[in-house]
From Swiss-Prot:
Keyword vocabulary terms for this entry: FAD, Flavoprotein, Menaquinone biosynthesis, Oxidoreductase
Known pathway: Quinol/quinone metabolism; menaquinone biosynthesis
Phenotype of gene-disrupted mutants: Cells lacking this gene show complete abolition of the synthesis of MK-9(II-H2) accompanied by accumulation of MK-9. They have similar growth rates than wild-type in both aerated and hypoxic culture conditions. However, mycobacterial electron transport efficiency is reduced by 3-fold in mutant cells, but mycobacteria are able to maintain ATP levels by increasing the levels of the total menaquinone in the membrane. Proton motive force (PMF) and oxidative phosphorylation are not affected.
Gene source species: Mycolicibacterium smegmatis (strain ATCC 700084 / mc(2)155) (Mycobacterium smegmatis)
GO biological process assignments: menaquinone biosynthetic process
EC number: 1.3.99.38
Function statement: Catalyzes the reduction of a single double bond in the isoprenoid tail of menaquinone (MK-9) in M.smegmatis, likely the beta-isoprene unit, forming the predominant form of menaquinone found in mycobacteria, MK-9(II-H2).
Organism superkingdom: Bacteria
Protein name stated in the entry: Menaquinone reductase
PANTHER family tied to this protein: CONDITIONED MEDIUM FACTOR RECEPTOR 1, GERANYLGERANYL DIPHOSPHATE REDUCTASE
SUPFAM superfamilies: FAD/NAD(P)-binding domain
Length: 409
């Protein structure tokens, strides 16, 4: 059976469901299509930064968030030092959270459904059709049926199968991430701090360009994981599952870990807007599909929620009829400066000696680590007037001017 909607959203994760909710609230007839049945799991650290918390509050989820664990900031460990940094930045809530993706994604999807978006779950989009002017006029499902649309939002994740059909290209000369996470029982599962171990070593003792994490979930378990940065020239030199098991053994006594990590899932993450082909006449890529992932920590939920809202606003504003250049331009206005300088810093971390030399120095400076937490947490806005924000924006402008490939191009 074929159907039709004003807006079709492919993907019911945080980005797609946020876009669907905002578009439905603007009066659009919305259909969300996802290959999975919900609830479903997703490879993720489950962390919700203060910026992500702010977006969830915009969606009306404040009361739901109040029932979840709250974290005051980030505890960082490594190179012989430990430091706790409260979440900085004047423009966002003072706390973060962590919610398993089986719960978070289904909750945001339910918000979109309550707002009027229709759900087609367990249904995969495999292709699109175009009208005579080149606009997408329908998505093709794996059973051969179609869903017609006036506008299309693609939020099908980092690999973005539909994005590739539409012409998305991933440029691997900048950094990308590889990561794995699991869940493990710990008596510290209700701690009000998330922990990152910045001195991530392989079982052979080699310092890796990445970090390990322990994110308390408040349910008796922590999200445990490891992630590493890589480039086409310097691919990740680590087998992820053995590395996570080794990391768990290192943390076992300190965290009272019980058993082995369960439900291990890994991911490959394009980062920092390292894709082109993110829009066409009546379609846009958002969230992970548009490589909206922080190059310094692999976080993407806040960008997914934001780009979902921004895409819906662009679609429903009535002022733009062709998104081919409007959407990349909007993404660049919001994220290109930060992504550009973050990609350069992350690239330095892939150099074998850089982290070993700079890590011990940085970890002994509360000022440097406060700056690091703020930029890693995406906690700088254009409205912030303090010196850290001004320096970060200036560095982003300078970095963008010398980019061989600007983010999203």
């Amino acid at each position: 059976m074929n159907t039709r909607a004003d807006v079709v959203v492919v993907g019911a994760g945080p980005a797609g469901s946020a876009a669907a909710a905002w578009a439905a609230r603007a009066g659009r007839d919305v259909v969300v299509v996802d290959a999975a049945q919900f609830p479903r799991d997703k490879a993720c650290g489950d962390g919700l930064t203060p910026r992500a918390v702010a977006e969830l509050q915009r969606l009306g989820m404040a009361s739901w968030l109040d029932t979840r664990i709250r974290h005051h900031g980030l505890r960082m460990s490594g190179f012989g030092a430990d430091v706790e940094i409260p979440w900085p930045g004047p423009s966002f809530p003072a706390t973060s959270s962590a919610v398993p993706r089986t719960e978070l994604d289904d909750r945001i999807r339910s918000v979109a459904a309550d707002d009027g978006a229709k759900m087609m779950l367990g249904t995969k989009v495999v292709d699109v059709t175009h009208d005579s002017s080149g606009r997408v006029d329908a998505v093709v499902l794996d059973d051969g049926n179609t869903v017609g649309c006036a506008q299309l939002i693609v939020a099908d994740g980092a690999r973005s199968t539909l994005g590739r059909v539409l012409g998305r290209t991933w440029h691997r000369e900048t950094v990308y991430g590889v990561a794995i996470r699991g869940y493990i029982a710990s008596p510290r599962a209700s701690e009000p701090w998330i922990t990152s171990h910045l001195e991530l070593r392989s079982p052979e003792g080699k310092v890796l360009p990445g970090y390990g994490w322990m994110f308390p979930l408040g349910n008796g378990e922590v999200n445990i994981g490891v992630g590493a940065l890589a480039t086409a020239k310097r691919p990740a030199d680590a087998a992820l599952r053995p590395l996570m098991s080794y990391y768990a053994d290192l943390r076992r006594e300190e965290w009272g870990l019980v058993g082995e990590p369960r439900a291990g899932l890994s991911a490959l993450l394009p980062m920092g807007g390292a894709v082109s082909g993110v829009a066409g006449p009546n379609w846009m890529l958002i969230g992970d599909a548009a490589a909206c992932v922080n190059p310094l920590n692999g976080e993407g939920i806040d960008y997914g929620l934001e780009t979902g809202r921004l895409a819906a606003e662009l679609m429903t504003s009535g002022g733009v009829t062709d998104y081919s250049s409007a959407w990349p331009t909007l993404l660049q206005e919001h994220y290109a400066r930060g992504f550009s300088v973050a990609r350069r810093l992350a690239l330095l971390l892939t150099l074998p000696r850089f982290l070993q030399v700079t890590g011990p120095v940085a970890m002994r400076s509360a000022t440097l680590m406060t700056i690091a937490v703020r930029v890693m947490g995406n906690l700088v806005t254009d409205e912030d007037a303090d010196w850290i924000a001004r320096v970060w924006r200036t560095a982003g402008l300078a970095s963008r001017r010398i980019d061989q490939r600007v983010p999203f191009s």
